[in-house]
Each structure stands twice: as structure tokens, then as C-alpha cells.
């Protein structure tokens, strides 16, 4: 069996896909297959991908109607054969030793090799117990919440991870991670070397967050945590919702923010569990003045 399957979902990435492909094929760890999923591109992306089929036998190309990035990733998983799976976005690149560094974290006692260890702390622990890592994942600490830059054992990468409606196109990676960390009981291996070079995510540049979207996204996030674990991770889940509210509220007008289901649900939960949260968090939510929110976010949080 191939060691690593690298899956790249592609949509109208003609200006970046060649550099992305070259960075993968030039890896020092060459026991890999590269699966390029052309998700209905209307530019030259698909044609560029096809030129690599004859150049390198490790390359496979899938052409499909446009279904969105999440569906494209799952299509790649279905056609892959590697024992381990990783994802790369079409506008990103891998440092030459990225896969080699990640593969050093592979062992029989892990299903996940987390390659963004530098984002958690300066520590050099080689693994983190799954219970502790779940707390980090639910709070979205560091770079947890992005599918790239890590390895996943094939047995835990199931269709359930990608089962989302197409319009959930921002924040969906976090749902993937939450579902993933509750699909294994094994410790998570940690890699601290640089394993990913991020490009520009043009989708995030044009996406407009709304309070209704935040509410729906949060419903999927909550459902990703199994019912038996909801009480254990409640504080972490609420902290993450507050953090998300801080992040998007500067773009919302005061009336919409105060009246939104997303805000009201957070406020209700915070009142019930107020002892678990800081004065700053409670004060921020209690006084939703735009100027006050901006001041607190800048100077206190």
C-alpha cells in the first residue's frame, strides 16, 4: 500500500496549481500518490492537471461537476489508496521535506499526525493525549481546525467527516476536525517543523459572514461533539462561540448583532454558566455597543 495520498481540490486555480503540484512531486518523501480533483473549473486548471498524468505515474486526475471543496476532498479520498491521507489546497505549496517530517510522526499508537505543532506552544512533546487534544480542538487553539498540514490514518477518514451541505463553505474545516478527534481514542502525534506554505484563500476574501450563517455553522459544530461529551466540553464550546462572535461582530450592525439567534443563545448559556468565564467575556456580551466592543477587543481581550 502507498504510504501517503495527497489530495488537492481544485477550482479555477490555473495561476497557482502548477507550483502546488511541483512542490508535492518534488518531496523528499516520494512514497506518495497525488490525486488532483478538478471541481468543475472553468479556466485551464483541469488541462494543466492532465499534463502531469504522463509526466509522473504517481499522479491521478479526477474531473467532476462543481460540487464544492468539501465534496471534492471526499471524492479524492474515495479514489485514494494510501495508508495515510493529507490535503493540500490548490493555491498552497509544501516545503520539500514536509511529508518526510510528517511521516516521522507515524506510529501504531496514533491515527493523527498534527503538523502545526508550532502554533500550540514552544513545547516539544511528541504526542498529546486525545482527551487534551480534544479540548484544544473544541476551542480551536492554534492551527487546529485546518485540514492541511497533517496526516490522517485512512481508517478514520470517513464520509461522515465531509457530510455537510454545500453552502457551508467557510468554517467547514473546523467541523471536519471536531468530527475527526472524536473518531479516535489514540494520542495525537505532534510535528514542529514547517510543513506547509499557505497561499491566499480567495474564498475567504469575498465571503460575507452573517449572524444566521454563524448560527447554522455553530449548530453543525455542536452536533460534531457526541452527546455523551457535550457536558465535558461545554465550556470549551462556549468559549469558541464567544471568540467567533468577537471575530465577526465588528462587521455586523448593532441591531442585527443583539437580535441574532447566535448572540442570544451565547448570552443565555453564559448567564447559566457564568462562573466558568472571565469578567471580560461577560462584560463584552452584556454591553454590545460597537465602540465599546472595539475598545475591549483591542485593549482587554
Q: Each PLM stretch: what is its role?
A:
Residues 85:
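Short aromatic/hydrophobic "clamp" motif used to bind/position activated sugar donors
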Residues 95-163:
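Flexible acidic/His/Gly-enriched loops in nucleotide-sugar-dependent glycosyltransferase catalytic domains
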Residues 23, 38-47:
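A conserved acidic beta->alpha catalytic loop
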Residues 134-213:
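Conserved nucleotide-sugar donor-binding catalytic segment
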Residues 251-301:
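Membrane-interface aromatic/basic loop that binds lipid-linked glycans or pyrophosphate carriers
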Residues 185, 194-201, 206-270:
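Catalytic core of nucleotide-sugar-dependent glycosyltransferases
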Residues 22-31:
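Short, acidic, metal-binding catalytic loop of nucleotide-sugar glycosyltransferases
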Residues 64-80:
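Glycine-rich, basic loop-to-helix element that forms the pyrophosphate-binding segment
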